[in-house]
UniProtKB/Swiss-Prot annotation:
Its EC number is 6.5.1.2. GO terms for biological process: DNA repair; DNA replication. This is DNA ligase. The gene is ligA. Transmembrane segments: none annotated. SMART domains: BRCT, LIGANc. It comes from Azobacteroides pseudotrichonymphae genomovar. CFP2. SUPFAM superfamilies: BRCT domain (SSF52113), DNA ligase/mRNA capping enzyme, catalytic domain (SSF56091), Nucleic acid-binding proteins (SSF50249), RuvA domain 2-like (SSF47781). It comes from the Bacteria. NAD(+) binds at residues 31-35, 80-81, 110, 133, 170, 285, 309. Zn(2+) binds at residues 404, 407, 422, 428. Coiled coil: none annotated.
Length: 663
């Protein structure tokens, strides 16, 4: 046997041991024997570097530090699931599927893992890329870190897998590994992780793959995607994937009746704590991929799936105090400080009280015994008070402040709103810092600056509003403690680069109340310059799709303030994009043609297809009518659109047909 054959055999043997140990829990060698073989392989690879293989089991533990994570567009959007906490919600889902399909169907019931979603791309049996969910359209490339997760195969077994496919799953932090690392962190005087989900998410974003490899993350795969899948059954495809080396849970049941579904949910609701990982519900999926395609999707969720969330656990603890926090828009949020208590695997110290109405309804007093639960919210909430345990004297009632806790300005409350606001946004420190943080965020100006740095700049008097960022010089920063010249240069360059950010993102970054990313895009399209937007009236604004009186009044109020107008004049002076750059058509092959885009695409994203349509003289529309010329259809086109297209005689074209049109 030559050296190359010996190395190949060792790799194959260790891959097989890894699979048996981490995926199917059937180890066939001792840890000592495994480590011995791995060291032998490492030694041979070091002696014969010409036989290096990126997919060797020795390459699971990374040695390099990543400086950042690249942004990757998903081939298929990673949609979030609609969820329900009630049997009524399950029945509504089941009956809706029954009505739309009007044929027999099967529901696959699976556990809902409480971890981090991941998308894995394989080509020719090799792991090509691993991407986080991100915003559903774009995620972080965490391939280097995912390669250290031993239950994820770098090379697949067999040869009956598609040449190119995507498989999705959940990265979980098993309870044993989670408890072990928290014990170590406490012994090292480090703060423990709050829960396995947060720990898994933080670990995936760790810049050192060696740290990731030491934390023993696990992965369960739950959905196969691609053009050439072997079966129409979601369940059968997962069983095939298990044979290729993927870890697929055996806790899946194909149900034909609502009773079978409820039995599955009830069983695992009772026994969920016996599992080696955290779960927070059950996912129901229509098993047939053909039927999934017929059912399609709504805006952010597939119609063919729903998550049933287990009822939240409730605990009793003591209220010590209430903090009133000031957000970037001036909203005052009350937060309860509690006696630490264990709730659903998490140490809870704080709970949201939301607003004054809830405080009054609870009749809250300092020292009260509170009932706290953690449902679908990240921050737990107080749901009740044990008034019988309240002392007859000495308990101070919790009263909502009349003045801002940060700047002492009298608070205001708008009609039909539950929140109180501090109107002093030009001088209230938390609002100023929050506005600058929002303006600099990735989705807005993408300036390389964090909250701690903004705090440092604020204390030094370098910033009091968003425009001040463009006045900070390298010498100003070098006067501050712990700032090196390279860091100062990087910050200033990042600020200069932000001047190329398009108008709609600048508009979003201004932080106008109720103006999120989508609304900002619509405003920028309707009013191509900031000057036009600043003089728009209520009638002009409310004619825009998706903009009602509340948003319109907020925009008008923003531009009626002289401080804001002065701020915009400064931003314009510094060279920010406060106008829409008119697109120049590359071609006019689609001139006069209107398109609707529907479904999920493989070659390009929906946004890219919209751009191609406009660049070739076509027009994108959002609603289907007899005037629509084409529907550019991907996978999972909605059934309603299909029916309307047939009624209006609209031509439905595929990706390939569209691309031929613009060749």
């Amino acid at each position: 046997m030559n050296i190359k054959q010996k190395i190949d055999n060792l790799r194959q043997e260790i891959d097989n041991w890894n699979y048996r140990y981490y995926v199917i829990y059937q180890p066939i060698v001792s840890d000592f024997e495994f480590d011995k073989k791995l060291k032998e392989l490492e030694k041979l690879e070091a002696q014969y570097p010409e036989y290096y293989d990126y997919y060797s089991p020795t390459q699971r533990i990374g040695n390099d530090i990543n400086n950042n994570f690249a942004q990757i567009n998903h081939i298929y959007p990673m949609l979030s699931l609609s969820n329900t906490y009630s049997w009524e919600g399950i029945n509504d889902f089941y009956n809706r599927i029954k009505k739309i399909l009007n044929e027999n169907f099967v529901i696959a019931c699976e556990l809902k893992y409480d971890g981090v979603s991941i998308s894995l791309i394989y080509e020719s049996g090799l792991l090509l890329r691993a991407v986080t969910r991100g915003d559903g359209t774009t995620g972080d490339d965490v391939t280097t870190n995912i390669r250290t997760v031993k239950s994820i195969p770098l090379k697949l077994y067999g040869n009956n897998y598609p040449r190119f496919f995507e498989i999705r799953g959940e990265i979980v932090f098993p309870w044993a590994a989670f408890n072990k690392i928290n014990k170590e962190r406490i012994e090292n005087s480090e703060p423990p992780f709050a829960n396995p989900r947060n720990a898994a998410a933080g670990t995936l974003k760790t810049l050192n793959p060696q740290v990731v490899s030491q934390r023993n993350l696990d992965a369960y795969l739950y959905q196969l995607l691609g053009d050439n899948l072997s079966s129409d059954s979601h369940y059968e495809n997962l069983q095939l994937a298990q044979g290729w080396g993927f870890k697929v849970s055996n806790i899946i049941k194909c149900c034909k009746t609502i009773d079978e579904i409820e039995n599955f949910i009830n069983y695992w609701g009772k026994w969920k704590k016996s599992l080696p990982f955290a779960v927070d519900g059950v996912v129901l999926k229509v098993d047939s991929i053909r039927q999934q395609s017929l059912l399609g999707r709504i805006a952010k969720s597939p119609r063919w799936a729903i998550a049933y969330k287990f009822q939240s656990e409730t605990v009793k603890t003591t209220l010590h105090s209430v903090d009133f926090q000031v957000g970037r828009t001036g909203i005052i949020t009350p937060i309860a400080n509690l006696e630490p208590v264990l709730l659903s695997g998490t140490i809870v110290k704080r709970a949201s009280l939301h607003n004054e109405d809830i405080i009054n309804a609870l009749d809250l007093h300092i020292g009260d015994q509170c009932y706290v639960e953690k449902g679908g919210e990240i921050i737990p909430k107080i749901t009740g008070i044990n008034k019988e345990a309240r002392l007859t004297f000495g308990n101070k009632a919790v009263n909502f402040p009349k003045n801002c806790p940060a700047c002492n300005t009298p608070l205001i409350r708008f009609q039909n709103e539950t929140a109180y606001y501090c109107p002093n946004y030009t001088q209230c420190k938390p609002q100023i810092k929050g506005m600058i943080t929002h303006f600099a965020s990735r989705k807005a100006m993408n300036i390389n600056v964090g909250e701690e740095t903004i705090e440092t700049f604020y204390r030094a008097g370098l910033v009091r509003d968003i425009a001040d960022l463009y006045e900070i010089k390298i010498d100003d920063i070098l006067q501050l403690k712990r700032w090196a010249e390279k860091s100062a240069i990087n910050f200033v360059e990042s600020v200069q680069q932000s001047k190329q950010v398009p108008y709609e993102r600048v508009l979003y970054g201004l932080g106008i109340h109720f103006v999120g990313e989508v609304v900002a895009k619509r405003l920028a399209k309707a009013f191509p310059t900031i000057e036009q937007l600043s003089i728009a009236n209520n009638e002009q604004l409310t004619t825009i799709d998706g903009i009602g009186n509340q948003i319109a009044q907020s925009v008008i109020q923003y531009f009626s303030n002289e401080n804001n107008l002065q701020l915009i004049r400064r931003l314009k002076l510094y060279g920010l994009q406060l106008f829409t750059i008119q697109k120049i058509f590359i071609d006019n092959k689609l001139a006069g043609k209107t398109f609707i885009i529907s479904g999920i695409f493989r070659k390009y994203s929906r946004d890219k297809y919209k751009e191609l349509i406009e660049n070739n003289g076509g027009k994108n529309v959002s609603s289907l009518s007899a005037k629509t010329d084409f529907i550019l259809s991907g996978v999972n086109m909605g059934p309603v659109k299909l029916i309307k297209a047939q009624r209006f005689g609209i031509k439905i074209i595929s990706e390939d047909e569209f691309l031929k049109m613009i060749e």
